[in-house]
Amino acid sequence: XXIGIFYGSSSGVTGKV
């Protein structure tokens, strides 16, 4: 992480890059 673009499914965020 870090802080940046959210990634994961459209229903919920998995984490941040």
From Swiss-Prot:
Keyword Flavoprotein: yes
Cofactor dependency: FMN
Keywords, ordered alphabetically: Electron transport, Flavoprotein, FMN, Transport
Domain Flavodoxin-like: 3-17
Keyword NAD appears in the UniProt entry: no
Similarity field: Belongs to the flavodoxin family.
Function: Low-potential electron donor to a number of redox enzymes.
Protein name (Swiss-Prot/TrEMBL): Flavodoxin A
Species classification: Bacteria, Pseudomonadati, Pseudomonadota, Gammaproteobacteria, Pseudomonadales
